[in-house]
Amino acid sequence: MMRFYSLLLLFLTPFAGAVAQQGEVFIDSALPEGWNNGDCFDQTMPPDDEWWQNFEDPVLDSLILYASENSYSVLGAMENIRKARAAWNIARGKMLPTFDLGMGWQRAKTSGNIASTMYTEAWEGQFNAALSMQWQADVFGSIYMRSKAQKMLFMATEEEFRAVMVTLVANVATTYFSLCQSVEQLKVLRENVKSQREIMEIVISRYNSGLASKLDVAQSRSVYYSTMAEIPAMQATIDGYRNKMAVLLGIYPQDLAGWPGEECSLPSYMEPIGVGVPAMLLRRRPDIRVAEKQVEANAAQLGATKRDWFPEVLLTGSIGFSSGEMKHLFRSKSLTWEIAPTIKWNIFSGGERLNATREARAALDQSIISFNSTLLTAVQEVESAMSQYKSSVEQIVSLREAVNQNEETLTLSLELYKQGLTEYQNVLDAQRTLLTYQGYLVQAQGGSLIYLVQLYEALGGGW
């Protein structure tokens, strides 16, 4: 019988090696060699790993460090890694034999009304102690392939953790710059309120002297109070960003304790940055690596379903002691043992194995499609972020000049108004225009930093 098993395994093993070969080509089309909007960026250098340090803002650095250690999204991702590791260990453990240790006592009474017992009642007792073993020899690799699939899923979970970190760092930086932008806008409003109040006092003085109309006074007050009305709304916006920051840090807003406060300011950062080439995204972006590991996991699962078509090789056995009396249980004469190698080959399962293979193939094809979609989205996100950052920098240059010209316009119109050489309407228009473009400039400065953060995130975050 053992010779038959050996010949059967020798016959089937070569066929098992031909099942579910790996190495499918994941990428449908080659990645571009460069970026469409890369002329303002350094494509020869990869992105900085700790990119947030380029802003040289210690408050931002401390916020990111605190969030990376305390955010609930990070803690949840770490638990997912633990869960995935346990699932992988379970799958690996199935490649090993299982052992069971059992001890027991049995007592039975035989009937005295049966001829086989010679119409004599009898009591029988038996003590048992045995170590049993069962092992499925993974001759054709089914268990191994399932273990490999779980390993790939575990590695995908590690990449998902990195993706959470990349997103968290980007969210902290974006929220911080949005907060600083709102603080800068609040400063602009307060500075304009101060300037408008001074101008309003000039108009009132001229009105009292008979040099200005009551309409001029009403218009100056209208501008002043309109600007004042924007301050509470901007303060509420600041509070909203602070509350959002608290959530990212994993604390209550009450525990933020003025960190960050109204002293934060937007850093000036317009230096060319390294973006590398599109091919670097394959190794830098964790979401692409997650998709890649899912493809590999599904490929391994497909291999496992194909190997399920081959026989199972089982080995069971036990060794122990059995005796009618406890005092004789562990004597040599009480020793018992059993070994039973088995080959089990399911030749009909109602289409279960066939459809399991089809399902695994569909899952693999779907994951390959998802991989290519993720890759395409990654390239699009980088291109969009580069274009937005480039445009915002150009916009800042123009807006700075616009603000300078409007400041000069306000100064000149006010001087002419004091001399009675122009109407107050010119001063009024200059005030409104200056406030508008100062707000535009702050928005563009904050927006450029946010676009830069989005670019770093699209490039893989460097975590």
Whereabouts are the PLM-identified features?
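Short segments within alpha-helical structural elements
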Residues: 25, 197, 226-254, 305, ...
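Periplasmic alpha-helical coiled-coil/stalk elements that build and connect Gram-negative outer-membrane
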Residues: 28, 143, 152, 159-277, ...
